[in-house]
């Protein structure tokens, strides 16, 4: 009888801990996606202007920089 009670208690405890862990990991995945989205927004390639030394054939240069050497291959952003 004691062994049966111990087994039932153990099974209930393990089931409850799995349910709690599954709930927790689902929430973590959601927040991880938000964090990754924010990191992608701040990614170097996601900017709308070229920084010093970067090409200016796709995006215009950032404020304070000028596109120099704009031949067929495009120019490079340099200080004014």
Curated annotation (Swiss-Prot):
Q: Tell me where in or outside the cell this protein is found.
A: Secreted
This one is known as: Conotoxin Vi6.2
* Disulfide cross-links: 49-62, 56-67, 61-77
Q: What is one term from the GO cellular component aspect held by the record?
A: extracellular region
> What is the annotated tissue distribution of the protein whose record heads this document?
Expressed by the venom duct.
The leader peptide range reads 1-22
Q: What does this protein do?
A: Ion channel inhibitor that inhibits the increase in intracellular calcium upon depolarization in DRG neurons. In vivo, both intraperitoneal and intracranial injections into mice induce hyperactivity.
* Residues modified to 4-hydroxyproline: 60, 63
Q: Which InterPro entries match?
A: Conotoxin
Q: Which family does the record assign?
A: Belongs to the conotoxin O1 superfamily.
- Annotated Pfam families: Conotoxin
């Amino acid at each position: 009888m004691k062994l049966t009670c111990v087994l039932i208690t153990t099974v209930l405890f393990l089931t409850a801990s799995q349910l709690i862990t599954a709930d927790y990991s689902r929430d973590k995945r959601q927040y991880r996606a938000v964090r990754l989205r924010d990191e992608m927004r701040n990614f170097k390639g996601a900017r709308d202007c070229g920084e010093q030394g970067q090409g200016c054939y796709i995006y215009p240069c950032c404020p304070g920089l000028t596109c120099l050497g704009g031949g067929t291959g495009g120019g490079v952003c340099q200080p004014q």
